[in-house]
Amino acid sequence: MFSSAVRALCRTVPTVATRQLSTSRALLSLRPLGPKNTVPAFKGTAVVDGDFKVISDQDYKGKWLVMFFYPLDFTFVCPTEIIAYGDRANEFRSLGAEVVACSCDSHFSHLAWVNTPRKDGGLGDMDIPLLADFNKKIADSFGVLDKESGLSYRGLFLIDPSGTVRHTTCNDLPVGRSVDETLRVLKAFQFSDKHGEVCPADWHEDSPTIKPGVATSKEYFNKVNK
């Protein structure tokens, strides 16, 4: 599924072990956890602020949670995603949301990656937890595990304060995800939940929304279709 590491990871030298990822036919049979499902219970050791900490789904009760999976530490697309989400963690927190990144690596691998400088392909200091799923149970419960390779695909789940999945995406390995889009969708669900109106395509905070109903929706359609 992927080739062996070209060079061994050395903890004392900031050298990145190169990992080559390829796609699998197993992706065709993946069934990521969809909207309206209850988030599975999870618990594991994460790297938080440069140390090990056990975290679980219970830590996020009453909060919005962005839970995203990535294939492997010390790869190429993955650090760009994790750094992008980590660098904007406070934007999520301002909306009452937390972000957790998870892969099937060990917490020791996560720590080595955090301790590797970004200029060498590492993560550097992180403002979000990196959860270790070494036994692959978490990825499997969320439906993003490729059992042939033991990798998790790029699944992302937006979970509301009641523990209900509201939004799911799952990318094939070569393409990373958008922080801007995740924030947009989070704000849209929060607006809809609060106001009871629905959000049309490409909705942003300054965009009109729709009052659901045959008659009431015409206010929106008349406004945007002049």
Curated annotation (Swiss-Prot):
Active-site residues, as the UniProt record annotates them: C78
Keyword hit for Disulfide bond: yes
GO biological process: cell redox homeostasis; hydrogen peroxide catabolic process; response to oxidative stress
Catalysis performed (reactions): a hydroperoxide + [thioredoxin]-dithiol = an alcohol + [thioredoxin]-disulfide + H2O
Molecular-function GO terms, alphabetical: thioredoxin peroxidase activity
Protein family: Belongs to the peroxiredoxin family. AhpC/Prx1 subfamily.
Entry's EC annotation: 1.11.1.24
Species, as recorded: Caenorhabditis elegans
A Pfam match: 1-cysPrx_C
Keywords, ordered alphabetically: Antioxidant, Disulfide bond, Oxidoreductase, Peroxidase, Redox-active center
PROSITE patterns linked: THIOREDOXIN_2
Function: Thiol-specific peroxidase that catalyzes the reduction of hydrogen peroxide and organic hydroperoxides to water and alcohols, respectively. Plays a role in cell protection against oxidative stress by detoxifying peroxides and as sensor of hydrogen peroxide-mediated signaling events.
Annotated protein name in UniProt: Probable peroxiredoxin prdx-3
Gene behind the chain: prdx-3
GO CC terms in record: cytosol; mitochondrion
InterPro entries assigned: AhpC/TSA, Peroxiredoxin, Peroxiredoxin_AhpC-typ, Peroxiredoxin_C, Thioredoxin-like_sf, Thioredoxin_domain
Domain (Thioredoxin): residue spans on this chain: 33-191
